């Protein structure tokens, strides 16, 4: 006996361009390149190795820098190293030369600790090590490192503390 409701078979839509669909799907699922200079110079029609070679970057560092230098270089190898997109290299070098943002800060407890030590002892780290506020029993060298860290992050405050300590 047959089924009450007829099962529909798959139908093919002739009005859809399969080539465009495939290209769109491939582009959608491709990884997003985070670096803007490389992303703008990227050609989707070429392979990764060819794209990077045009930009002057190496896809495989082992092939770029051989272990043993070859004595005679082929003319073809030298000819293939022509950089077609030098602006990518310049952009990456400009990004690399920018100063990095300091992410590590100093906790408020450390600031109070260093201020207390410097206000009471100036730069006498051995006396700081014997202070009763030295809860963690830091050595003079460890205290000096903490003071130097505070100096780097708050140079004006540290200079004001030192001048006030000298005047007393």
Swiss-Prot record:
Q: Does this entry carry the keyword Nucleus?
A: yes
What's any one GO cellular component for it? nucleolus
Keyword annotations for this protein, in alphabetical order, are: Nucleus
Q: Which domain of life is it from?
A: Eukaryota
List the Pfam families hit by this protein, alphabetically: Nop16
Among the GO biological process terms of this entry, one is:
ribosomal large subunit biogenesis
Predominant location category: nucleus
Where in or outside the cell it occurs: the entry states: Nucleus, Nucleolus
Q: Which family does it belong to?
A: Belongs to the NOP16 family.
Name of the protein this chain belongs to: Nucleolar protein 16
Q: Report the source organism.
A: Xenopus laevis (African clawed frog)
């Amino acid at each position: 006996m047959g089924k009450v409701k007829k099962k529909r078979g798959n139908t093919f839509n002739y009005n859809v361009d399969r080539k465009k669909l495939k290209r769109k799907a491939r582009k959608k699922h491709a990884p997003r390149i985070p670096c803007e200079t490389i992303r703008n110079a990227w050609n989707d029609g070429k392979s990764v190795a060819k794209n990077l070679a045009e930009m002057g970057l190496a896809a495989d560092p082992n092939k770029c820098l051989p272990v043993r230098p070859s004595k005679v270089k082929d003319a073809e190898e030298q000819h293939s190293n022509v950089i077609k997109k030098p602006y990518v290299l310049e952009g990456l070098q400009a990004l690399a030369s920018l100063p990095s943002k300091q992410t590590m800060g100093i906790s408020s407890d450390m600031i109070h600790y260093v201020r207390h030590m410097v206000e009471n002892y100036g730069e006498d780290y051995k006396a700081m090590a014997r202070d009763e506020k030295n809860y963690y029993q830091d050595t003079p060298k460890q205290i000096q490192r903490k003071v130097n860290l505070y100096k780097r992050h708050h140079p004006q405050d540290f200079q004001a503390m030192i001048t006030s300590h000298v005047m007393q």
